[in-house]
């Protein structure tokens, strides 16, 4: 009697493990693509941030130059 339950348990266990492996094999590629897209977005934000900082520095230098030129109106 116990051997019959053990056999049923093993069959159900194999089916469950097979289903889990199928689920994981379908889940892993989508998880990898999601992580890579997040990494790319992070890089893009960092690049845009550095471009924005450069633009702010350029505007500040431009304003400093205008301020300097306003002190010497002849030039």
UniProtKB/Swiss-Prot annotation:
Instruction: Please indicate which superkingdom the organism of origin belongs to.
Output: Eukaryota
- GO CC terms: extracellular region
What start and end residues bound the annotated signal peptide?
1-22
Tissue expression from the record: Expressed by the venom gland.
Pro-sequence residue ranges:
47-75
Family the UniProt entry places it in = Belongs to the non-disulfide-bridged peptide (NDBP) superfamily. Short antimicrobial peptide (group 4) family.
Its name, as the record gives it, is Peptide Ctri10036
């Amino acid at each position: 009697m116990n051997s019959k339950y053990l056999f049923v348990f093993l069959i159900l266990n194999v089916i469950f493990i097979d289903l889990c492996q199928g689920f994981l094999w379908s889940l892993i590629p989508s998880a990898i693509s999601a992580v890579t897209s997040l990494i790319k977005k992070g890089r893009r934000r960092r690049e845009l941030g550095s471009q924005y900082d450069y633009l702010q520095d350029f505007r500040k230098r431009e304003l400093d130059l205008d301020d300097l030129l306003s002190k010497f109106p002849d030039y």
